Amino acid sequence: MSEIITSLQTELSNRHANMVSEAVLAFSEHHDSALHSYFLNARVKDVILESLRTTEEKLRALDKLQLDASKNLSNLLVEYNSINAELESVNSKISSISSQEYALEEFQALSQNFEKNLVQHRRNSQNKLKCAMEKLKMIETSTHKAILDNF
């Protein structure tokens, strides 16, 4: 009888040891899986944060390009208004000349002087507008390039 009890105790001890071993292995596997998941989540968060920082930098660069374009458009509007004011001045001078009587020589001298001033004004206006349009085109090109490169 004592042999049976000893045999049963041995079997019970072996089964208990196997169960404890299996439990320790299962816990170890679960722990490894949890650690792996934790490290994976941390890496994903780092990648997302880096992507967010990069996107924010790109948006700031685009905001700067937009601000530059707005300033250039504002300068174009100022030039446009300046040209309109000068054209109104020219029209006023034409009206003034037309309403007064001049001797032929005076009128020719006045006309030539007026023509020179008008040609010079036209050149100056064209140069200013050309420069402003070139700046605007450069900003537009930079903006398109930045958008294509960044998004």
UniProtKB/Swiss-Prot annotation:
UniProt entry tagged with the keyword Cytoplasm: yes
Which intervals of the chain form a coiled coil?
Answer: 56-140
Q: Which residues form the signal peptide?
A: none
Q: Is Cytoplasm among this UniProt entry's keywords?
A: yes
- Localisation per UniProt entry: Cytoplasm; Nucleus; Chromosome
Which residues span the membrane?
none
Question: One biological-process term from Gene Ontology?
Answer: meiotic DNA double-strand break formation involved in reciprocal meiotic recombination
Print the keywords alphabetically: Chromosome, Coiled coil, Cytoplasm, Meiosis, Nucleus
Which top-level group of life is the source organism from?
Answer: Eukaryota
Q: What does this protein do?
A: During meiotic DNA recombination, binds to and may help activate DNA double-strand break (DSB) hotspot sites.
* Name of the protein: Linear element protein Mug20
Q: Which organism is it from?
A: Schizosaccharomyces pombe (strain 972 / ATCC 24843) (Fission yeast)
**Gene (UniProt):** mug20
